Regions:
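A solvent-exposed beta-alpha-beta segment
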Residues: 4
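Solvent-exposed soluble domains appended to multi-pass membrane proteins
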Residues: 7, 11, 15, 22-181
Length: 181
């Protein structure tokens, strides 16, 4: 259940000495605007950052979101490039009787700039899932100031097929293209 999943996340955070902990896309088990975010923030050590993905709800819209949480602040980045038929139904007005997506009907594209600063003034480009394949969407003057790229994803649904491996290698290619680890 979701409470047990959150307890496991909190336990991992509490027991870790790492400065940055990165969890998968949609790993946060509740809607992000839920007060349970405080439970994560309260268990973060000083100079520690947790990066985790989840679903955010705001003004009747759902967003696939990356959270950057430290002891004093929570930043978020909403996915800008959504997966057709997975995160939204193209031509919904014509196909409104088709229910392909479990959960919210459609996610909404994010509008926030792509750069997050960690506590130690290091900056990274947040990327969610398959956004990494659209290199021209990452070519933003703002991103040239980034120190590295973080791509959170949940490729478990691919199983043992090629998808996760292709995703991993595309991420490596982007890092080389942008000269970022």
């Amino acid at each position: 259940n979701n409470s047990k999943k959150l307890d496991n996340i909190i336990e991992l955070i509490s027991n870790s000495e790492s400065e940055i902990l990165i969890f998968a896309e949609n790993n946060y088990p509740f809607l992000i605007n839920d007060l349970k975010l405080e439970a994560i923030q309260n268990n973060i050590k000083n100079k520690q950052t947790v990066i985790i993905g989840g679903t955010r709800f705001n003004k009747n819209n759902y967003f696939n979101t990356l959270l950057n949480i430290n002891k004093s602040k929570i930043n978020y980045f909403d996915k800008k490039i959504l997966v057709p038929f997975g995160e939204f139904l193209p031509l919904r007005n014509y196909l409104k009787n088709i229910e392909l997506i479990s959960g919210p009907n459609d996610y909404t594209e994010g509008k926030i700039d792509r750069l997050i600063t960690l506590q130690n003034k290091i900056r990274y480009i947040p990327v969610i899932c398959y956004e990494i394949i659209f290199y021209w969407k990452l070519l933003d003057k703002l991103n040239y100031d980034a120190n590295f790229i973080i791509n959170i994803t949940n490729d478990i649904w691919f199983g043992k097929f090629l998808g996760p491996y292709q995703h991993f290698y595309l991420t490596k290619i982007r890092a080389v293209e942008f000269n970022k680890p």
